[in-house]
Regions:
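A residue-level marker of the well-folded mature domains of exported/periplasmic proteins
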Residues: 20-220
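Short, low-complexity disordered leader/linker segments with a strong preference
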Residues: 1-32
C-alpha cells in the first residue's frame, strides 16, 4: 500500500512544519510525536498498517531509535480495545494519533469529539462527521482492482478458456473492500461482459489460511 506510506509521510511533514511555525529544520529536530493505532493484524499485516508504519519510520529516519518517545504503535487485540486505546493515546503526550481502516470509524468519531485539542487521522475513510481535529483520507481502490480484473480476464482469453468463471476473495465486507470488488468485476466485464463472477468473504482481516482455502475451492 504505497499510497498509505505516501499519505503518512506527507501528513507528518506538513504537521511538522505547522508545529514549528514553518521554521527550517529536520524531522529529527521537529520533535513531532505520533502514535499509530492498529487492529489485531498489527504493523506486519503487509497492508495499510505496515505501510503506515513504514511511512512513520521513513519520516524520522532514525532506524527505530525514537520508538517509544517520538513515535510508537499500539495494537488492539479486539475492537473492544479501540475506544480505550484512542483515549489513552489522546491523554498521552502524542501530537498526532493515526488509525488505519474503516473499522476504526465509530471509535475515532466518538473519541475525537471528547478530545477537541488532539489531532487525529483516519486512513481509508471519508464519510465521518467533519471536525477540525480529524483528517480523513480515502483512496480510489477500484482503479487498481479494475486493472487486476482486466489482467485476469485477458489471460483467460489468451489461454483459450471457454466461458471462464472468475472469483473474488475478501476479508470483511464493508465500504472499502466493496470498492475493490466492484473495480475487479468491472475489469473482468470489460473483457467478458457476461462473465460469471463469484465472491467469498472470510469475515476476518487476519486469516490468510481461510482465504487460501476459499480460493482453492473456487479452482476445484
Amino acid at each position: 500500500m504505497k499510497k498509505t506510506l505516501a499519505i503518512v509521510l506527507m501528513v507528518l511533514c506538513v504537521f511538522s512544519a505547522f508545529a514549528q511555525g514553518a521554521a527550517e529544520g529536520t524531522a529529527k529536530d521537529d520533535q513531532v510525536k505520533v502514535v499509530l493505532l492498529t487492529d489485531a493484524t498489527g504493523i506486519d499485516d503487509k497492508s495499510f498498517n505496515a505501510a503506515a508504519w513504514r511511512g512513520i519510520l521513513a519520516f524520522y529516519g532514525d532506524e527505530g531509535a525514537g520508538r517509544g518517545t517520538l513515535y510508537e504503535n499500539i495494537t488492539a487485540q479486539t475492537s473492544d480495545d479501540y475506544v480505550p486505546n484512542l483515549k489513552n493515546a489522546a491523554e498521552a503526550d502524542w501530537d498526532l494519533v493515526i488509525t488505519t481502516g474503516f473499522t476504526w470509524g465509530d471509535a475515532v468519531t466518538e473519541v475525537a469529539a471528547l478530545y477537541p485539542d488532539q489531532k487525529f487521522i483516519i486512513v481509508d475513510v471519508d464519510y465521518l462527521p467533519k471536525t477540525d481535529n480529524l483528517i480523513q483520507y480515502i483512496y480510489e481502490e477500484e482503479q487498481g482492482s479494475y486493472l487486476v480484473g482486466v489482467a485476469a480476464a485477458t489471460q483467460a482469453k489468451l489461454d483459450g478458456i471457454a466461458n471462464p468463471k472468475f472469483g473474488f476473495v475478501g476479508g470483511v465486507a464493508g465500504a472499502t473492500i466493496t470498492k475493490f470488488e466492484i473495480g475487479y468485476i468491472e475489469g473482468v466485464k470489460s473483457v467478458y461482459p457476461d462473465a460469471e463472477i463469484v465472491d467469498y468473504y472470510v469475515n476476518n482481516w487476519g486469516d490468510p489460511a481461510s482465504a487460501k482455502t476459499a480460493a482453492k475451492s473456487m479452482y476445484d
